[in-house]
């Protein structure tokens, strides 16, 4: 079980921002990544459809031996996380809890903005999670439905996306938030635009980065680090990157798409660079 891969899935390429952090934080771990581009974006879809898509993909990953499931999609995590933890005997890591913890720690004035898909914002998942952590924090949530389609088309700079960001983020500027949660794993590709609009004095919390950091913590807690990792007496040893001296077999990282694998590969290289040499079409999931 320890040497099995980590299963990661998202509605498209956005979850690769999570995969990139996992690679940085746990470099000897193998990964199976599925991007459900056949059904992207998840944001505007009905809750029942998102749960159905997510269940089919997670079932497939577990059936292929994943030792952990990472839901690298805020929309999916907002409606599927609790169900997934009931369904599977492996740890399931979501994105909302770690990002919320970071936002609560980061805010100085107690006003936090959350941006995400329509589905994520409508679910109230971030609002509830942050309120549970600190009920005194004001949470101002804004849905940004066009951000994901722009990122999926590879458009992350330029006048059009800048104008869109200014319109979406104006309500957060008006209430004076000092921290903004990027509540979609596609949004780190828009960090430059969002930071420019919000200003340097506003802290951006990447849900992707926070979820990626959560993975080695859970691996340690569940004693699931693979045999390539050193014997660690605490998580601090793992965080110290002592694994860098390991000279054993290379981890296996596979990337699959329910849609066009060639288009996925072109976009995916913006997230993980040339390490993505091949993307396969995953069979049996497109008719979910």
Swiss-Prot record:
What broad class of enzyme is this? Answer: isomerase
Concerning Pfam families, the annotation shows: Asp_Glu_race (PF01177)
Q: Which PROSITE patterns match?
A: ASP_GLU_RACEMASE_2 (PS00924)
A molecular function (GO) term? glutamate racemase activity
Q: Which reaction does it catalyse?
A: L-glutamate = D-glutamate
Q: Which GO terms describe its biological process?
A: cell wall organization; peptidoglycan biosynthetic process; regulation of cell shape
What keyword terms does UniProt attach to this protein? Cell shape, Cell wall biogenesis/degradation, Isomerase, Peptidoglycan synthesis
Q: Which domain of life is it from?
A: Bacteria
Q: In which pathway does it act?
A: Cell wall biogenesis; peptidoglycan biosynthesis
Q: Where does substrate bind?
A: 10-11, 42-43, 74-75, 185-186
**Catalytic residue positions:** 73, 184
Could you say which EC number(s) this protein's record lists?
5.1.1.3
Any idea what job this protein has? Provides the (R)-glutamate required for cell wall biosynthesis.
Family, as annotated: Belongs to the aspartate/glutamate racemases family.
What name does UniProt use for this protein?
Answer: Glutamate racemase
- What is the source species? Corynebacterium kroppenstedtii (strain DSM 44385 / JCM 11950 / CIP 105744 / CCUG 35717)
Which gene does this sequence derive from? murI
């Amino acid at each position: 079980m320890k040497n099995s891969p980590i299963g990661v899935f998202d509605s498209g390429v956005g979850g690769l921002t999570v995969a990139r952090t996992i690679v940085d934080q746990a470099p000897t771990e193998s990964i199976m990544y599925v991007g459900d581009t056949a059904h992207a974006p998840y944001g505007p879809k009905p809750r029942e459809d998102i749960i159905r898509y997510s269940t089919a993909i997670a079932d497939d990953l577990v059936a292929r031996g994943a030792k952990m499931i990472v839901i690298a999609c805020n929309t999916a995590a907002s409606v599927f996380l609790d169900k997934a933890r009931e369904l599977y005997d492996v740890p399931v890591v979501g994105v909302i809890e770690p990002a919320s913890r970071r936002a609560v720690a980061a805010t100085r004035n107690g006003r936090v903005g959350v941006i995400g898909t329509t589905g994520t914002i409508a679910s109230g998942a971030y609002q509830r999670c942050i309120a549970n952590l600190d009920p005194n924090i004001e949470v101002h949530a804004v849905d940004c439905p066009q951000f994901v389609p722009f990122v999926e088309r590879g458009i992350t700079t330029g006048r059009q996306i800048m104008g869109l960001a200014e319109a979406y983020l104006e309500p957060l500027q008006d209430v004076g938030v000092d921290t903004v949660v990027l509540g979609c794993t596609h949004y780190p590709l828009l960090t430059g635009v969002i930071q420019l609009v919000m200003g340097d004095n506003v802290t951006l919390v990447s849900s992707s980065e926070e979820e990626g950091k959560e993975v080695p913590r859970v691996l340690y807690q569940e004693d699931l680090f693979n045999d390539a990792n050193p014997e660690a007496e605490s998580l601090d040893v793992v965080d110290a990157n002592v694994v860098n001296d390991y000279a054993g077999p290379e981890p296996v990282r596979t990337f699959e798409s329910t849609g066009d694998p060639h288009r996925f590969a072109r976009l995916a290289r913006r997230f993980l660079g040339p390490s993505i040499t091949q993307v396969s079409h995953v069979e049996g999931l497109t008719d979910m």
